[in-house]
Amino acid sequence: MTSVQIKYSANFVRQFKKLSPQLQKQAIKAEKLFKKDPFSSKLKTHKLTGKLNGLWAFAINYKDRVIFEFIEKGGVLFHKIGSHDIYKV
């Protein structure tokens, strides 16, 4: 099984840098799991609806999420990272 190729939006990178070091470590751990299996039950990966239709999200922990989309050639683009507030458009 090949690992998922991940690209990062400028917005995602900015948000990631603002996270606490502890949350950054949790996010990196979740990303490693995501690369191996984007639909691991530990990540609670789910489709988004409404204004975020076409995007997906997975859980870093109980409170924090990553919003992403599947792109060409089996890759994904990480759009946002943070608490549930990232769902607000």
Where are the model-predicted features located?
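Residues that form generic nucleotide/phosphate-binding pockets
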Residues: 15, 30, 51
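Compact soluble domain cores
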Residues: 23-37
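A short, surface-exposed loop/turn module that caps and links secondary-structure elements
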Residues: 33-57
